[in-house]
Amino acid sequence: SAKDVKFGDSARSMMIAGVNVIAD
């Protein structure tokens, strides 16, 4: 569903943000 896609995008964005924080 569209909700699932939005949730997936949010989770991916949070994961990427976490990786960026660790990289810093």
Swiss-Prot record:
One of its GO terms (molecular function) is ATP binding. It is found in: Cytoplasm. Its EC number is 5.6.1.7. Induction: By heat shock and ethanol. It is an enzyme of class 5 (isomerase). Its main location: cytoplasm. The keyword Ribosomal protein does not apply. One of its GO terms (cellular component) is cytoplasm. Keywords: ATP-binding, Chaperone, Cytoplasm, Isomerase, Nucleotide-binding, Stress response. It catalyses: ATP + H2O + a folded polypeptide = ADP + phosphate + an unfolded polypeptide. It comes from the Bacteria. The keyword Cytoplasm applies. Belongs to the chaperonin (HSP60) family. Forms a cylinder of 14 subunits composed of two heptameric rings stacked back-to-back. Interacts with the co-chaperonin GroES. Together with its co-chaperonin GroES, plays an essential role in assisting protein folding. The GroEL-GroES system forms a nano-cage that allows encapsulation of the non-native substrate proteins and provides a physical environment optimized to promote and accelerate protein folding. This is Chaperonin GroEL. The gene is groEL.
